[in-house]
Structures are given as C-alpha cells and as structure tokens.
C-alpha cells in the first residue's frame, strides 16, 4: 500500500512498516509524528515560549521518511510532494522548514494509508497547475 506514494520504493516501504510495526498503537496522526520525531516540542521558561524539532523520536523511521521526501523532490518529478514543497518555499519558509513540513505531511499520509488500508490517491485541485513551473526558488 505504501508503494502507491510517489517516490516510495519497496525498501523504504518495508523500513517504514518495520519501524511502525502495528499502526493501532498510535491513536492519531500526531502521536505517530511524535514517535517519528516530526512533531514540534515546546520549551518554555517564564514568559518565553519556543518550539524546536524533537530529536528523540525513532531515527530509523525519520530517516525513511526523509528519503521518501527527497524522492519526491527529484528534478523532473511532478509529485504532490514537490508541489507542496515549492508552495511552502514561496510562502516564505526556509527550505529546511519546508522539508520538515513535507515530512510531516508524508507521515500523515502514511498514517491514513495504514489505518484505512487504501492506496494513496492524490486529487488535483485548482491550486495544483500541471503546467506551472515547479522550480524551487533560490
């Protein structure tokens, strides 16, 4: 089922499944993202509140999601992940922050696929123009 995601090879899919084991362990997409290390952590002291990336998650799962995200960002790839990444960069996010957003989106999709037991289907909407230039801004 995971191989229906663009850029997901057999090796990446098996790595994701072997690290997640049973999807029923996670009550929500947020719980899976936290397990993977993709959910932001809050660090507060007094009036100051900051959010940072949690590095304590499952690094093997995070690495598999990272490889999947880069598979969607290929130079000639017209995947939904590339559109999402370009959209986030054009919104003003740094490339690293946009990559984090893409990884979180992918882990949400993985959760949906494994809970619903359905292949991934991307519906093109008006915001995704096939003829649009998908070059990543410098």
List PLM regions with ranges.
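Phosphate-backbone recognition surface of nucleic-acid-processing proteins
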Residues: 1-4, 10-95, 131, 135-138
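Basic, amphipathic alpha-helical segments enriched in Lys/Arg and hydrophobic/aromatic residues
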Residues: 90-138
């Amino acid at each position: 089922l995971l191989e229906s995601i663009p850029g997901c090879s057999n090796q990446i899919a098996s790595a994701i499944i072997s690290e997640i084991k049973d999807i029923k362990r996670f009550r929500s997409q947020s719980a899976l993202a936290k397990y993977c290390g993709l959910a932001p952590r809050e660090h507060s002291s007094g009036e100051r509140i900051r959010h940072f990336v949690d590095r304590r998650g499952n690094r093997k799962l995070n690495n598999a999601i990272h490889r999947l995200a880069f598979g969607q960002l290929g130079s000639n790839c017209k995947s939904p992940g590339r559109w999402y990444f370009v959209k986030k960069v054009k919104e003003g996010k740094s490339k690293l922050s946009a990559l984090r957003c893409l990884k979180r989106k992918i882990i949400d999709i993985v959760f949906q696929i494994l809970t619903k037991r359905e292949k991934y289907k991307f519906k093109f909407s008006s915001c995704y123009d096939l003829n649009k230039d998908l070059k990543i801004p410098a």
